[in-house]
Amino acid sequence: MSSQHSTDDLMNSHVFSGGFSTLDDKGFQDVPIHTDMPGSISVEPSSEDANVGSVNGNINETPVFEADRLIAEATMNPSAASSTTGENSISQTGSGPFLRIRIVDIEAENSKDPVIKMNVQTTLPAYRSKLYKNVRRTHAEFKKFAKYLISTHPECLIPAVPEAKTSVSSGIKEDLIYLKSGLQSWLNYVSTNPNLLYDPELQLFVESDYGYSPLINTGNPTSGLKRKALKQFPLPPDPCQALANLRPIVKSFYKNAKDAEIKLEKLVNRKQSLALTHADLGQSLIDYSVEEQHNGLANALNRVGKMLQAISDVRIMQSSKQLVTLADSLCYASDNAFVVKEILSNRHILMRDLISSKNQTNSYLSAANRLQDSPKISKARTDDALQALEVARVHEKLLSDKVDFVTLNLVKESKTYTKKTSVSLQKAIREYVEKEAYYERRLLSIMESIRPHIRNIDPFGGLSRLGREEYPRRLSNPPPSQKTNQDAWTNRKRPGYSSSFDGSSQSTFNPSNNDGAHNTSENADELVEPPIGNERLDPKSVANLLNAI
């Protein structure tokens, strides 16, 4: 019988119930929270973290319900959350309350402050309706809401709101695509974060008819004179090493990203000035070709002028793409890093307030002990001192719970922030390199288009015979220059470098080669050059190689 009872007790224990007590048992609500700051903050959440206070100053005495805890775990765990499908959709896990916000259109009549139209679907009980269509908010209202969230939620790394226009222009289709993608990503974060989901300002942001403005105007505690004064003091001791190392890294990243953006903009401005100079030079050559008496040279000058104008157009488009792909990405990354730095500074202010509260509690405790030991002090005065001590202890406990809660959430969100920043910058750099390669190929194609006109200035090969004693044959159909065995601008084969590129000799022509080369008997464009072996080149041959076009 004793073994049967022990077996029943084991089956009814929390070992087989997942390690958590049920909601009716309320066992997890009785876990005490230590008022002293721990020596180290655990990165992984535990069941003791359920009974934490609110982060908005007013501490809720009731614990976090089990349903809210499950929603928070499902949202903060990337492996449990479903991946987003498409650009504007948000996948929700489970059957709990959710909030989905999807941008349907952007009205860019006012380029400085476009209007964003959204459809909202929710099952949260506090909302008046389950579906809101064509909710209109301006870009300035988005920034007001983001400023409120940054000030009142120090436990969340709120992303920065993307700018209303790119560095190139405003109101065009490409700008709207970038803005829609950035705002949708920002709304996805706000609507899926469990710490922001039940904020009353989020409900007001959705349900306001026109002209949204936050009801609580809270200024940034790390701005103005207080921020400058706090910079003069050393940072408070930080028990969380991850966040202690994160802030200097984010600050350095913010400065370097902003500096790289400024330098890239200067480079683009100079490239655009160079492109305009190319266009002016091309027009001058076109005007000069009209006065030229030699037909071949006049045609070549005209073609070179048009080529320079085409190069100018491509350079301007290339510089615009550089601003959109890389400069705007660096600008948003620096803005986002600045917001993260501000939020980490808000945490330092909370830690300073906690240290001040502990010192005040110790002073009240010393005063109460002195009053109790003195027989001449009235009982009313002693009661007042004890009451003040109790208030100080409650305030210290609330601040301690708030700092622990903020630290735990910031450790989680810092990992997500670093990962998203790395992925976004990798994507921007990849797109930047692809666009650069595309435009450089276009420039090479434009330059190669005038090769026949340069070589056909006269019947003897034009400029292609510079530096040679003998006249080369007329070039009519030169091969493209995208080869490793020759340079089509000079049509010279390079047997001396053949071993470094491939195993075959490039001085011997192979008619079965499929790289686009032509047979010498079919195309008389090959220049007759003396073979160059492995022996030392004489200065005259080197000069011919360097001066050839």
Swiss-Prot record:
GO CC annotations on file: cytosol; endosome; nucleus; prospore membrane; retromer complex; retromer, tubulation complex
Low complexity composition-biased segments: 498-507
Disulfide links within the chain: none
One GO BP annotation of this record: intracellular protein transport
Entry keyword set: Coiled coil, Cytoplasm, Nucleus, Protein transport, Transport
One Pfam family it belongs to: PX
Polar residues bias locations: 508-522
Principal subcellular localisation of the protein: cytoplasm
Residue span, PX domain: 96-213
Subcellular localization(s) per the UniProt record: Cytoplasm; Nucleus
Coiled coil: 250-281
Gene Ontology MF, one: phosphatidylinositol-3-phosphate binding
UniProt-annotated stretches for the region Disordered: 470-540
Subunit details: Component of the retromer complex which consists of vps29, vps6, vps35, vps5 and vps17.
Stored PANTHER family: VACUOLAR PROTEIN SORTING-ASSOCIATED PROTEIN 17 (PTHR47433:SF1)
Protein family per UniProt: Belongs to the VPS17 family.
Stated role: Plays a role in vesicular protein sorting. Required for the endosome-to-Golgi retrieval of the vacuolar protein sorting receptor pep1/vps10. Component of the membrane-associated retromer complex which is essential in endosome-to-Golgi retrograde transport. The vps29-vps26-vps35 subcomplex may be involved in cargo selection.
Name this protein carries in UniProt: Vacuolar protein sorting-associated protein 17
